[in-house]
UniProtKB/Swiss-Prot annotation:
Record-linked Gene3D superfamilies: Cupredoxins - blue copper proteins
Binding site for Cu cation 1: 98, 430
Enzyme Commission identifier(s): 1.10.3.2
Domain (Plastocyanin-like): residue spans on this chain: 25-171, 173-336, 382-501
Chief location of this protein within or outside the cell: secreted
Glycosylation sites: 467
Enzyme kind, highest EC tier: oxidoreductase
Cofactor dependency: Cu cation
Gene: POX2
Residues the entry annotates as binding Cu cation 4: 427, 484, 489
Protein name: Laccase-2
Misc: POX2 isozyme is the most abundant laccase of P.ostreatus under various growth conditions.
Pfam family, one: Cu-oxidase_2
Species per Swiss-Prot/TrEMBL record: Pleurotus ostreatus (Oyster mushroom)
Amino acid sequence: MFPGARILATLTLALHLLHGAHAAIGPAGNMYIVNEDVSPDGFARSAVVARSVPATDPTPATASIPGVLVQGNKGDNFQLNVVNQLSDTTMLKTTSIHWHGFFQAGSSWADGPAFVTQCPVASGDSFLYNFNVPDQAGTFWYHSHLSTQYCDGLRGPFVVYDPSDPHLSLYDIDNADTVITLEDWYHIVAPQNAAIPTPDSTLINGKGRYAGGPTSPLAIINVESNKRYRFRLVSMSCDPNFTFSIDGHSLLVIEADAVNIVPITVDSIQIFAGQRYSFVLTANQAVDNYWIRANPNLGSTGFVGGINSAILRYAGATEDDPTTTSSTSTPLLETNLVPLENPGAPGPPVPGGADININLAMAFDFTTFELTINGVPFLPPTAPVLLQILSGASTAASLLPSGSIYELEANKVVEISMPALAVGGPHPFHLHGHTFDVIRSAGSTTYNFDTPARRDVVNTGTGANDNVTIRFVTDNPGPWFLHCHIDWHLEIGLAVVFAEDVTSISAPPAAWDDLCPIYNALSDNDKGGIVPS
């Protein structure tokens, strides 16, 4: 980046920081992983959270749910030092952080999924995630990638601003206050909860209510008349998908999973776990309060008593709950997401025409209570896949876990088909290290090779004829996880690893080498997640 552009980028980020009310870190800084007592929906419990101040400091006035915002600019080098200060043995005490949506080109060791690219970080230790973001911008997030730890609270938004954003003329305001996070929340800590539990509530920007619970404060998003806001919607869900809308307002969608798209106007968005959208809202309605709605597909649905809701408040409106009603007729369809730049899938425009074609048949084993892909559940290996590769293993046959590793050669077009056969769908599948082109979407029987949606999380659908199909090019060496982003499903096996161009994988820093010996020496008490007998 030339000096003038770097100065502009720095000023841009400073303005975002200045106008955003929320604490933020980045592109360098300490992220403290601590246990904090929280009550985001009126129910008090301990949680695992990410914040900008250590455990020894006073608890922030605002609970650390969601976690601290990380932000920077396109072209930045991110140096995020994760400091583990966890002490509550009822939840996991070790941790590992995934920076969702980043390619990690040349830094697969920093991708974060435990036992795929690293061993977890022990309590009392720290680990520096150091990675470059030369050519990505948009809306991302981060979360624990160790077992189901992020369901206990360790998740937060991550925004990379682009001073040369091609959509810049469409909005006036884009800062920390225009980030909208959606979370499912549980009153029982994950290690003690059911294998696939039902959420107790929905949190919007860390606040919500549960059915039959107290009238807890809801998140308020403030706007001024006639201004245009770029809202960044992030689903940090462990399970449900949400149907999102704002009463009386249309949503001009301009980004999906950090990919700029041809703008499209809708009035509702179905968003699955791990997905992100940016939309522009023009505050052109009467000065009033308007309901923001995020209706989950499971748990307590609807909006009675203010559940699954937040408030859009115009400057000058009374501080009251809205009385507005919902009327939506134009939902966002994935098949209408057209990339703004370089649309089109790689490879010949025929199904099965890629260099490598893989069918992933998902199923549920009622005997073992495991979800499988091609008959095999993903069981985390003792040694991370990356460590195995660096130690000399290079073929699918020699890598563990057996049956869950798929070796991919460099510079090949890969086509993955995922028929919707497994129970518990729709399954939102996320591929690490890449975006992909969705040449066949859920609910569609046609293939689109010319203008397919490009993203990093895709819903596999539930229809008997659904066969979601994606394509990508193997241009990024590393062991890349492909998994269901319903965290409870990942925990019982719904994942595979693509060992891509293994001979070109970059070596990790020396501190990475220390993670496994430290972790392997820990006692069960040090690892946490102890379930009372």
